[in-house]
Amino acid sequence: MEKIKVALVSLGCDKNRIDSELMLYKLNEEAELVKDPKEAQVIIVNTCGFIETAKEESINTILQMASYKKTHNCKVLVVTGCLTQRYKGELKELIPEMDIMLGVNDYDKLLESIKVFLKSGEKSFYHKYSDTKINEGNRILTTPTYTAYVRIAEGCNNFCTYCAIPRIRGKYRSRKKENILKEVENLAKQGVKEIILIAQDTTMYGIDIYGKKVLHELLRDISKVEGVKWIRLLYCYPEEITKELIEEIKNNDKVCKYLDLPIQQISNSVLKRMGRKTTKETIINIIKKLRKEIEGITLRTSLIVGFPGETEGEFSELKEFVSDVKLDKLGVFKYSKEEGTSAALMEEQIDEEIKEKREEEIMILQQSISKDINKEKIGKTYEVIVEGTKEDMYYGRNYEMSPEIDGEIYFEKDENVKIGDIIKVKVTHSLEYDLIGVVYNELSK
């Protein structure tokens, strides 16, 4: 393929981002990558098909990119990702402007499909389902140079009643430890300091290929890689957290004292309807244990409100939990009725208006909690990775803050500080979600 201009639009989660980065690396061998789709002759849209709003965004983006065939330089429109995997037949008819469609296991066919279309005009539509394949290899990072996501497993075995991911991504399959370590070593050589481990469920890592959960061993091995400063864990199911994992987080200085626990709900009756493999008691006990064992740990969660049949009593139980437990970070999603899931067939679907009201109530409650938690940080000093500038301020994150989903720390510009540096910042003021501070030196003690 001659050096044709290619742009890739990546939607959805950071697991999708990794697929996009893998595609970019392959494309870069024979194409010129451009950021602006209006300049591109080939446009690739890597879609999300998880919930209704994500599907709408994906379809709108595809249609917008398709319009560039008339208004700009686009000759080839490629659509990939979860939406194509989930709705392969419907999309083909709905959007005839698509020239190439690839499922989540077909990225190795990307370059060849583009070449064939440019030569003959022959369209390609692939959507292979796989319970064995894992997309891995070299990537071109779309994150800042100091941070990278590393996928340690693909797929999911949980089959929660509201979720379509196992039907899209297949069963849970861990990557080999040596492959992950090789990737981390390469990233560290590129200057990456923060490694963020992701999967549909990171806590189950290794169960399928090693016969036991070995996330703690993986953390220990990654921490030995020269250049890695922070290791962050996302998507940790509370019921799968082992004592070995707790010990490793506690004792390993490179592992951020931060855990993302996607509990989704707290009422046992709702958890049962969701098909979750845990209970209210288990969730509360693991939170208590983590706080007791790991000093200064930050806990984040995500909740779903408006699940089918959610009563006022069950919602009040959720509010009481949020108020009593006071998690450091919290996000709320309205239940989305997804085709092909058993929850979509449940009776007592909740009105959208009620969902919105419940979402707002939880967020108002959490805003107050977050404000109080942040006040306690005034006077404390943190290591901060510097991310950028806004007007006359620098901003960055400490170990308590994951990129994009959590707050930031702002501080005055310092001529000795560069983007990507890890420096010490002393907190002087607090807001609901963000902190304000000064670069720590002898004068700011």
Swiss-Prot record:
InterPro entries: Elp3/MiaA/NifB-like_rSAM (IPR006638), Methylthiotransferase (IPR005839), Methylthiotransferase_CS (IPR020612), Methylthiotransferase_N (IPR013848), Methylthiotransferase_N_sf (IPR038135), NA-bd_OB-fold (IPR012340), Ribosomal_uS12_MeSTrfase_RimO (IPR005840), rSAM (IPR007197). It is found in: Cytoplasm. Residues 142-372 form the Radical SAM core domain. It comes from the Bacteria. GO terms for molecular function: 4 iron, 4 sulfur cluster binding; aspartic acid methylthiotransferase activity; metal ion binding; protein methylthiotransferase activity. GO terms for biological process: tRNA modification. [4Fe-4S] cluster 2 binds at C156, C160, C163. Its cofactor is [4Fe-4S] cluster. It catalyses: L-aspartate(89)-[ribosomal protein uS12]-hydrogen + (sulfur carrier)-SH + AH2 + 2 S-adenosyl-L-methionine = 3-methylsulfanyl-L-aspartate(89)-[ribosomal protein uS12]-hydrogen + (sulfur carrier)-H + 5'-deoxyadenosine + L-methionine + A + S-adenosyl-L-homocysteine + 2 H(+). Its EC number is 2.8.4.4. Binds 2 [4Fe-4S] clusters. One cluster is coordinated with 3 cysteines and an exchangeable S-adenosyl-L-methionine. The keyword Cytoplasm applies. Pfam families: Radical_SAM, TRAM_2, UPF0004. Residues 375-441 form the TRAM domain. CDD domains: Radical_SAM. GO terms for cellular component: cytosol. Residues 4-119 form the MTTase N-terminal domain. Belongs to the methylthiotransferase family. RimO subfamily. Catalyzes the methylthiolation of an aspartic acid residue of ribosomal protein uS12. This is Ribosomal protein uS12 methylthiotransferase RimO. It comes from Clostridium botulinum (strain Hall / ATCC 3502 / NCTC 13319 / Type A). The lineage of its organism: Bacteria, Bacillati, Bacillota, Clostridia, Eubacteriales.
